[in-house]
Amino acid sequence: MSKLSHPQVLEQIKYGLIASCQPVDNGPMDSPEIVAAMAQASVIGGAAGLRIEGIENLKATRNVVNVPIIGIVKRDLPDSPVRISPFLQDIEELAAAGADIIAFDGTDRVRPTTREAIIKRIKELGCLAMADCSNFEEGMYCHNLGVEIIGSTMSGYTGGEIPAEPDYQLVKDLNAAGCRVMAEGRYNTPELAKTAIEIGAYSVTVGSALTRLEHIVSWFADAVKSAK
């Protein structure tokens, strides 16, 4: 955890960019040292905070930056579609590794641990909570349980075709209902990130367009190939 108080953490990320430093799994950049370097470079570039996946990545990053960190653990479970910080053990390890904010899957789906239990443990450990939600109802459910930040993270990722554009309406609706909204999901250009803040987001998270080099290069390579 940084040395910032909860109000200071929230103030620091307000209207700011969160850089999600999550390399492609098992790719050449998938190591704690490289994730920490990505994080440092992101902060130099102006990121107000970071989103880091994995305990070892979080530990390495916490050692080299002082900005707020949103910590998550991703898992692939045989009996649940929920991937983001699904167990109380995940919450405990993220807190111990230095997360200021712990994000969890806030969707209304089959899960190994209730949202209530996850939120309770986050608060017991002195961290802020962020719920990664897919729709307005889920966001309000978590908001009413005391979650400080509601993310649009899962919108478009719980079934069916993934939309090309971000879910602006969800950001607008949650903001209008009194939530601190983390706009996240398909904000892959500076203009889209700017729009998120303009329509009411508290902060905006950008991931692949900043830190997944394989994806970024493929966008350019595909565009160049299509020219002939």
UniProtKB/Swiss-Prot annotation:
Q: Which InterPro entries match?
A: Aldolase_TIM (IPR013785), NanE (IPR007260), RibuloseP-bd_barrel (IPR011060)
Q: Which Gene3D superfamilies match?
A: Aldolase class I
CDD domains with a match to the protein in the record: NanE (cd04729)
Keyword flag Cytoplasm: no
Q: Give the top-rank taxon of the lineage listed in the UniProt record for this protein.
A: Bacteria
Tell me the enzyme class.
Answer: isomerase
Q: In which pathway does it act?
A: Amino-sugar metabolism; N-acetylneuraminate degradation; D-fructose 6-phosphate from N-acetylneuraminate: step 3/5
Q: Name one Pfam family in it.
A: NanE
What EC number(s) would the UniProt record show? 5.1.3.9
A Gene Ontology molecular function term for this protein is: N-acylglucosamine-6-phosphate 2-epimerase activity
Catalysed reaction(s) here are: an N-acyl-D-glucosamine 6-phosphate = an N-acyl-D-mannosamine 6-phosphate
Q: Name one GO biological process term.
A: carbohydrate metabolic process
Specify whether Transmembrane helix is a keyword of the entry: no
Q: Which UniProt keywords apply?
A: Carbohydrate metabolism, Isomerase
GO cellular component term, pick one? cytosol
- Function description: Converts N-acetylmannosamine-6-phosphate (ManNAc-6-P) to N-acetylglucosamine-6-phosphate (GlcNAc-6-P).
Question: To which protein family does this belong?
Answer: Belongs to the NanE family.
Stated name of the protein? Putative N-acetylmannosamine-6-phosphate 2-epimerase
Quote the gene name from the UniProt entry. Answer: nanE
